[in-house]
Amino acid sequence: MKWVTFISLFFLFSSAYSRGLVRREAYKSEIAHRYNDLGEEHFRGLVLVAFSQYLQQCPFEDHVKLAKEVTEFAKACAAEESGANCDKSLHTLFGDKLCTVASLRDKYGDMADCCEKQEPDRNECFLAHKDDNPGFPPLVAPEPDALCAAFQDNEQLFLGKYLYEIARRHPYFYAPELLYYAQQYKGVFAECCQAADKAACLGPKIEALREKVLLSSAKERFKCASLQKFGDRAFKAWSVARLSQRFPKADFAEISKVVTDLTKVHKECCHGDLLECADDRADLAKYMCENQDSISTKLKECCDKPVLEKSQCLAEVERDELPGDLPSLAADFVEDKEVCKNYQEAKDVFLGTFLYEYARRHPEYSVSLLLRLAKEYEATLEKCCATDDPPTCYAKVLDEFKPLVDEPQNLVKTNCELFEKLGEYGFQNALLVRYTKKAPQVSTPTLVEVSRKLGKVGTKCCKKPESERMSCAEDFLSVVLNRLCVLHEKTPVSERVTKCCSESLVNRRPCFSGLEVDETYVPKEFNAETFTFHADLCTLPEAEKQVKKQTALVELLKHKPKATDEQLKTVMGDFGAFVEKCCAAENKEGCFSEEGPKLVAAAQAALV
């Protein structure tokens, strides 16, 4: 391999990109430039999302007013770039506008202190106050007729409310993708409000969209956490692996260019710079479509779409076919006598190339596994290149990957077998027991939320072909475990969880999988109130009923952490029978009052 050519290409792209950035920042008015690039509709939507993500407690009407004022100001600057304040940075303009909110101190407490800081510290301060768990009640949709009337009465306001409600609940949602989902939402109502049975049309379509939106939010939160906690290098490595799997015909220089651009886009969105993020994402889509011949044969269909659909299509595009003439990996990375020289001259480029070559050959591997293999390869070279005979030292490095590959394969196999046996709800309960014993200090709502999401991996991945299972499962687990890490970081209670979350991004899942029962945990005192139920349980939707039962299961385990699976099975079986009996009774509340204490006493006796 011609490393001089390779490295020259790498730096050529880096410098060309940097020059592009300098040109970008030379505009007289940044806000006018973004307004012109994005157009009024997308600009206003992004401003509404930005304010909703920063000021999560403010009413919708306040945000509409703020977004309107900023959009009008941008429009004026677009007409006359030398107008008053048009030359201010976007952070300054947005921060100044946030600090005009009269209720800032009352609603957000010490967040108001951010306004005493100067940029960029003020923006960093606002970012630090974003709340991943704002505690808003679940959204309850009105009747279909009322929804359709609201949609038809004022479509712009209706879609604005959608953006607001999602953004305030998900303060790191990928903003340009949220605009895309709002467009999908609009399409659902445009279709279903004409249907004879509006409810039958809306129900499944809204639920399918809701699932996509929740997954999109979790994925972007994972990306933002990767950037915030582990830096650009970790995010770029993740992106190289993912894009190399998806675009195996593209060369490493092309993948590197796209990864560099993609990293910038996500850094901007994670940093609250939504206008820049959306604009740069559109530019990246344009670049990919202009260069599709050197990236992938699968892009053409995406490139004929309008900008929002185009970017989304490119993000979800199917994997290209593998080139048929790929040489053995060993030739460049084991057998070449210059391995140590090439590694030491440009470590990140050499390791990036290894990751690229390995990933494009293994579309069946999870990104996390590919990164662990690259890390192992790096550690081997660090060790071997310091010896007298490096080639002998690293000769078997590719064979030594086997245990790292076997571990997630066996984990997925075992858990999919358990899922097939228990079904989703039973599988969730098994994970609840597992994770409560690993980290009993974590709050019960968090353990229930995370275990329910982990349990969905079975439904999502176990039905897939063997070649897709591991990639689906482990990458989904990485996203869900990130939710645990984000919530735990806010109120840390377990050193073991902190360790797994903070030591290594790629080893997070193996770290959690490897945790044993926490023997240092002091059991909670028994509280009968926790196990007291009322007739309202009977009318809850099935999912909420499951959460109530799972909450009781976690609390039982926190009281009796050494309870065996058989004991827990008995107690939860009794609990299910108790709920069924009382919900069928004529006097439901009377049944719960009378039978509840008996159940509690029986459970305590069974768990001795």
UniProtKB/Swiss-Prot annotation:
Under InterPro entries, the record lists: ALB/AFP/VDB, Serum_albumin-like, Serum_albumin/AFP/Afamin, Serum_albumin_CS, Serum_albumin_N
Q: Which residues form the propeptide?
A: 19-24
Q: Where does Ca(2+) 1 bind?
A: E30, E268, D273, E276
**Phosphothreonine sites (modified residues):** T444, T446, T570
Q: Which GO terms describe its molecular function?
A: DNA binding; enterobactin binding; fatty acid binding; metal ion binding; pyridoxal phosphate binding; toxic substance binding
Q: Which residues form the signal peptide?
A: 1-18
GO CC annotation: cytoplasm; extracellular space; protein-containing complex
What does UniProt note about where in the body, tissue by tissue, this protein is expressed?
Answer: Plasma.
Name of a matching Pfam family: Serum_albumin
Q: How does it assemble?
A: Interacts with FCGRT; this interaction regulates ALB homeostasis. Interacts with TASOR. In plasma, occurs in a covalently-linked complex with chromophore-bound alpha-1-microglobulin; this interaction does not prevent fatty acid binding to ALB.
The entry's protein name is: Albumin
Native species of this protein?
A: Canis lupus familiaris (Dog)
Name of the encoding gene: ALB
